[in-house]
């Protein structure tokens, strides 16, 4: 195999994305490998056989010609050049030729952090990391770092202390799931019993009144509509006792009036004495403006990579998202 030249090595931030659902080596002519100029020169830039499950592209050896992207009959390949400034800011990568997240949003106590970005850009991934449900591998998916290395990586930032407290269970995180239509698959029983089982704060009555859940108490969860499931999910998260509250798309299925009431309920969990953290992923910009104290924008290419910006005040963050241009990047 040839050793990549110095000119090629400088493009180390180039990423190759292969969609595992679209890539079908057994049904195509392996065009990605056949037409690759690097492979023709004797370099293993693309490794794939008709018996392979998926094509594997070396990002270090790829020259970014884009021939494989054009030749793939299933449109399963994407080659993307990233700024070199992101080279050492990888927070997590799910595997070779898969989605990559750069940086993390930094929550602040007693404030609502809003996350805004298109679908598939890494918002839910960031939430899972901040909730302690996903261990960030800093881009090293073959030999993931230990927590000591991860904490050292975030040394000097507010995230170091936050992640350390999550690890030590000094902070307890609760997350409202994104896809509320899946709730009946995992939970059974009446609405009242489910809420009572999760009620750890003396706010159940107020939350049910605000979210208009009182008339649903005797219903089974599999009888609820999408909007009713959404309000129930918000309520179950809000009435629980936690240090970090996370709401993933709380406005979906709700009308305008219900969205504003849900926003008021979410802001009600802030506790200045305790130093509560609240993080919200929201696509409704009006609700995001009403709900948040500061905003982080996520940009990139859906399904390929996502980058978290520095925090902005709400107005600037929303304007940056709408303009599609980040002045600080």
Feature names for model-found ranges:
Residues 234, 262:
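Hydrophobic anchor residue at the start of the ABC signature
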Residues 220, 247-251, 257:
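Walker B catalytic motif
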Residues 290-297:
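Conserved catalytic segment of ABC-fold P-loop ATPases
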Residues 116-118:
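The feature captures the beta-strand-to-loop junction immediately N-terminal to the Walker
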Residues 297-329:
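Conserved beta-strand-loop-alpha-helix hinge in the C-terminal portion
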Residues 91-102, 137-229, 240, 264:
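ABC-family P-loop ATPase nucleotide-binding domains
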Residues 29-51, 56, 67-84:
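Iron-sulfur cluster-binding cysteine motifs and their immediate structural context
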């Amino acid at each position: 195999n040839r050793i990549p030249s110095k000119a090629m090595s400088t493009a180390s931030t180039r990423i190759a994305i292969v969609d595992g659902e679209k890539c079908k080596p057994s049904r195509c002519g392996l065009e990605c490998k056949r037409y690759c100029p690097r492979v023709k020169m004797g370099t293993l830039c693309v490794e794939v056989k008709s018996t392979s499950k998926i094509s594997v592209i070396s990002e270090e050896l790829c020259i970014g010609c884009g021939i494989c992207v054009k030749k793939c009959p299933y449109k399963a390949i994407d080659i993307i050049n990233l700024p070199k400034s992101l080279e050492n800011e990888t927070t997590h990568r799910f595997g070779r030729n898969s989605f990559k997240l750069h940086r993390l949003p930094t929550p602040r106590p007693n404030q609502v952090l809003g996350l805004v970005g298109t679908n598939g850009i890494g918002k839910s991934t960031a939430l899972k990391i901040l909730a302690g449900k996903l261990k960030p591998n800093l881009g090293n998916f073959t030999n993931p770092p230990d927590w000591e290395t991860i904490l050292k990586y975030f040394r000097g930032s507010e995230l170091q202390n936050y992640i350390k407290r999550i690890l030590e269970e000094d902070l307890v995180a609760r997350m409202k799931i994104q896809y509320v239509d899946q709730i009946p698959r995992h939970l059974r029983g009446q609405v009242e019993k489910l809420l009572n089982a999760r009620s750890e704060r003396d706010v159940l009555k107020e939350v049910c009144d605000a979210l208009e859940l009182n008339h649903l108490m005797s219903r089974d969860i599999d009888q609820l509509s999408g909007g009713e499931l959404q309000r129930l999910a918000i309520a179950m998260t809000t009435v629980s006792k936690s240090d970090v509250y996370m709401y993933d798309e709380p406005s979906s299925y709700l009308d305008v009036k219900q969205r504003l009431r849900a926003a008021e309920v979410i802001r009600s969990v802030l506790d200045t004495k305790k130093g509560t953290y609240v993080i919200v992923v929201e696509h409704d910009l009006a609700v995001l403006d009403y709900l948040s104290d500061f905003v982080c924008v996520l940009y990139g290419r859906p399904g390929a990579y996502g980058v978290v910006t520095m925090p902005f005040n709400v107005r600037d963050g929303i304007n940056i998202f709408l303009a599609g241009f980040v002045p600080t990047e």
